[in-house]
Swiss-Prot record:
Keywords linked to the UniProt accession: Cytoplasm, Elongation factor, Protein biosynthesis
Metabolic or biological pathway, per its Swiss-Prot or TrEMBL entry: Protein biosynthesis; polypeptide chain elongation
Gene: efp
Keyword S-adenosyl-L-methionine part of the UniProt annotation: no
Name of the protein described by the UniProt record: Elongation factor P
Compartments where found: Cytoplasm
PANTHER family: ELONGATION FACTOR P (PTHR30053), TRANSLATION ELONGATION FACTOR KOW-LIKE DOMAIN-CONTAINING PROTEIN (PTHR30053:SF14)
InterPro entries, A to Z: Elong-fact-P_C, NA-bd_OB-fold, Rib_uL2_dom2, Transl_elong_fac_P/YeiP, Transl_elong_KOW-like, Transl_elong_P/YeiP_cen, Transl_elongation_fac_P, Translation_prot_SH3-like_sf
Length: 191
């Protein structure tokens, strides 16, 4: 679907320079001289490179609609991650580097959303919050309750994050998978 350059919004996926790009930031600029334009920060969906482009209102670009499908994580085999389509039960194999460092948070039976363009996977979204166990954490020091200091901890998946001083090894916590930060202690319904 063709749209004008001034209609590009953050989150839109467009085809530009023969590749797929997602608009990260958009800023409508009206200079004193000349016509208005839309300053857009684009991120390439295939290799992650960034690009700043100016689109005039008269320019048209191709807006792309991505298909989003739910997949269930089955298992890891070497560097390959195997997922199953929740509707057709077909299996999809993706390389670990396609998911990135967040691949460590994948758990058996976890539902993820895969973005497809012409039946080819171009992106994956994990749940924003995941329950994990702390396997190693320094003991809390006396007198640290006054300041809001955090201590390093290692999770069951090998990821290192900062946790509050009252957290100890063996406890379940909720971690933000996007920012890789501690959110809260896990309760019974999170497990």
């Amino acid at each position: 679907m063709k749209i004008n350059g001034n209609e590009i919004r953050p989150g839109n996926v467009i085809e530009h320079q023969g590749s797929l790009w997602v608009a990260v930031k958009c800023n409508a600029v009206k200079p004193g001289k000349g016509g208005a334009f839309n300053q857009v920060e684009l991120k390439n969906l295939l290799d992650g490179t960034k690009l700043n482009e100016r689109f005039r209102a008269a320019e048209t670009v191709e807006r792309v609609r991505l298909e989003q499908k739910d997949f269930t994580f089955l298992y890891q085999q070497g560097d390959a991650l195997v997922f199953m389509d929740s509707e057709s039960y077909e299996q999809l194999e993706l390389q670990k580097d396609f998911v990135g460092e967040r691949a460590a948070f994948l758990q058996d039976g976890m539902t993820v959303t895969v973005e497809l363009y012409q039946e080819k996977p171009i992106g994956i979204s994990l749940p924003d919050q995941v329950a994990v166990t702390i396997v190693e954490a320094d003991p809390a020091l006396k007198g640290q309750t006054v300041t809001s200091s955090y201590k390093p901890a290692i999770l069951e998946n090998g990821i290192r994050i900062l946790v509050p001083p009252f957290m100890n090894a063996g406890e379940r916590i909720i971690v933000d998978t996007n920012e890789l930060i501690y959110l809260r202690r896990a309760n019974e319904k999170d497990k």
